[in-house]
Amino acid sequence: HFEAAYPDVSVEPIEFDFADPTAGLAGGTTEVALIRPPVDLPEHRMLVLDSESWVACLPRDHPLAGRHEVEIAELLDDPIVCAPLTAGPWRDYWMAMDARGNRPPTIAAVAATYEAETTSIARGLGISFTTSSVARFYDRPGIVYVPIVDRPPSHVALVWHPGTLSPQADALIRHVQQNWGFEDGDETPLDQH
């Protein structure tokens, strides 16, 4: 663990809502963050730490709620609960804009947290697209999660700006690289995902 290897360095976990999917990197309030691309940070680098499949979060009485899996096209006409406009390309990604062609989504509600999102869905306002881990952590009465079989995986990445790192942040990145089996040069520009 990083703090055992570097006892004089404190890692401060800070949670950001959907309004800032860059987790403070864009505004410079954080040096290193765990995020889900895509985000608009062209000068940043990342290490992809994990990948997850997409799921649909549906009201329990939705016509497809009893299915074992769905395709994205089956859900594109449903009203959607989405992130705030400030989320930029991240919002578009989670509304599956790439699969919609020129059909704009019907926005049922805007939610800046998973709690607000799942509450809106449980109330029957709309659906959302998210990841399989959210299905494990945010199960609640009134909603059901159904795997989406035809979406590329969503990635979890450690992200940083290489030109502005403190020695402590650089040590954290090197620690992750060494302990997760990454080689020098395994990091990629953020715009490649």
Task: Provide a role label for each language-model segment.
Residues 36, 65, 70, 79-101, ...:
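Secondary-structure junction motif
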Residues 22, 26, 72, 117-118:
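Short hydrophobic/charged patches on amphipathic alpha-helices used for structural packing
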Residues 10, 28-29, 48, 74, ...:
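Conserved functional loop/turn residues at catalytic and ligand-binding sites
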Residues 144-193:
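A late-sequence structural motif
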Residues 41-48, 52-53, 114-164:
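Beta-alpha-beta core module
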Residues 44-54, 58-80, 167-170:
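Flexible hinge/capping segments at coil-to-helix
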Residues 17, 71, 112-113, 131:
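Short loop/turn segments at beta->alpha junctions
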Residues 1-41, 111:
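Central regulatory/effector-binding core of bacterial HTH transcription factors
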